[in-house]
Design a protein with these regions (language model features):
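N-terminal metal-binding scaffold of metallo-dependent hydrolase/deaminase domains
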Residues: 1-31
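A short, flexible low-complexity segment enriched in Lys/Arg and Gly/Pro that occurs
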Residues: 24-32, 94-101
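Alpha-helical scaffold segments that flank or form the walls of functional sites
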Residues: 41-42, 59-112
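Flexible loop residues that form catalytic
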Residues: 52, 86, 122
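Active-site microenvironments of hydrolase-like enzyme catalytic domains
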Residues: 116
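Conserved, mostly hydrophobic/aromatic
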Residues: 119
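Conserved small/polar residues in nucleotide/adenosyl-binding loops
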Residues: 124-126
Length: 126
């Protein structure tokens, strides 16, 4: 295992991140100033709460666009996101929501995780 500059809620640590089954179980090391060394940076992933698209694709394009969008976002540090719809006919939005639900359950490797949906509409009737 290599040492990294790890950003924690308490500040920077020079050390190692230990993980098991995809979860962080410990961070070993001591406080540091990353400017004092040439080690790589290890940062938490970002959660984007408003994603219309990525990689030239839009959420409203449906199932075929989702993998391009989520793969593009993970390349830039977004580990999870809320897919955001646009104002459209209700049937189109319903189809996209169904497809997003199915895609989110699959959780493809190498892609940002879809946590849910941000409905962006001009008016919602309940």
């Amino acid at each position: 295992m290599s040492e990294d500059n790890i950003l924690t809620p308490q500040g920077w640590v020079r050390g190692r991140l230990l993980h098991q089954d995809g979860k962080v179980i410990a961070i070993e090391g001591s406080p540091c100033n990353p400017a004092d060394n040439d080690l790589p940076y290890l940062l938490p992933g970002f959660i984007d709460l408003h994603v219309h698209g990525g990689g030239g694709k839009d959420i409203m394009q449906g199932r075929d666009a989702f993998q391009t969008i989520t793969r593009t976002h993970v390349r830039f540090g977004t580990t999870s996101l809320l897919a955001t719809t646009m104002t459209a006919p209700s049937e189109e939005i319903r189809q996209v929501l169904e497809q997003l639900g199915s895609y989110a359950e699959q959780r493809p490797q190498g892609c940002a995780r879809v946590l849910g949906v941000h409905l962006e509409l001009s008016l919602i009737h309940i």
